[in-house]
């Protein structure tokens, strides 16, 4: 039995490593820790290889996007999203301005999705889905073009929203994670299937935790 387990771990080491870094990534995301981005870069690099060897091409290209958006998200989170440092500070639960030894809040704050932004992102999702589906059906041998296109397109939108610290991105992740879990189960990627089930559960936790820190603009 131990030999079988050892052999399985050896044969799936790269995927298992990617799954572990992925879980660490989501934990850091829930905690709104900026170090989620470098961890995400490592996880994405691993899954580029995993998805390529499994012929899940749209998800492979998605990981390339994750690498790029991780760099941008890292910058936005550190600089407050505009390159200007926020001047508000938090003390005893109240937002104040000034010095007096108070810690300056420079990181991007959690906000709600604006209606106009939501419309734009919906249009972007539809365009991405159609484009991805046409590419997969005409230029690749992907066996799951519909689900692959859906997951990839929605993930691109969700990751951009995460980089901007928009609260509603968690709703998108809930959908993405459970649809992805079914896809990976059918492809025999069992460590990744377990990972996305965990992702789905953690998305509900993230939804609750981020709600506590939403910036109320007056």
Protein language model regions, located:
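Polytopic alpha-helical membrane-helix bundles and their juxtamembrane interface segments
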Residues: 1-32, 36, 80-81, 111-218
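Generic alpha-helical scaffold signal
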Residues: 17, 36-42, 58
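Internal transmembrane alpha-helices of multipass membrane proteins
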Residues: 40-49, 148-154
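Hydrophobic/aromatic-rich structural module bridging two neighboring secondary-structure elements via a short loop
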Residues: 42-85, 106-107
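A generic structural signal for solvent-exposed, polar alpha-helical segments
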Residues: 53, 72, 101, 179, ...
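Extended rod-forming repeat segments used as scaffolds/tethers
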Residues: 66, 101-103, 184
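Short, basic, low-complexity termini and linkers enriched in Ser/Thr/Gly/Pro
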Residues: 82-112, 214-218
């Amino acid at each position: 039995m131990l030999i079988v387990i050892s052999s399985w771990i050896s044969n799936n080491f790269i995927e298992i490593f990617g799954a572990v870094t992925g879980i660490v990534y989501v934990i850091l995301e829930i905690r709104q820790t900026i170090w989620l981005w470098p961890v995400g870069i490592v996880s994405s690099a691993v899954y580029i290889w995993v998805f390529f060897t499994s012929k899940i091409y749209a998800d492979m290209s998605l990981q390339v996007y994750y690498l790029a958006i991780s760099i941008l998200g890292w910058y936005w989170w550190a600089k407050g999203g505009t390159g200007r440092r926020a001047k508000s500070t938090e003390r005893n639960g109240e937002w104040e301005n000034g010095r007096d030894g108070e810690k300056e809040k420079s990181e991007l704050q959690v906000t709600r999705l604006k209606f106009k932004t939501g419309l734009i992102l919906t249009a972007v999702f539809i365009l991405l889905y159609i484009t991805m589906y046409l590419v997969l059906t005409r230029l690749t041998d992907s066996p799951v073009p519909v689900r692959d296109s859906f997951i990839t397109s929605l993930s691109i939108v969700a990751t951009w929203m995460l980089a901007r610290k928009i609260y509603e991105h968690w709703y998108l992740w809930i959908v993405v994670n459970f649809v992805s879990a079914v896809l990976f189960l059918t492809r025999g990627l069992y460590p990744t299937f377990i990972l996305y089930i965990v992702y789905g559960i953690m998305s509900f936790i993230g939804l609750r935790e981020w709600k506590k820190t939403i910036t109320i603009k007056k």
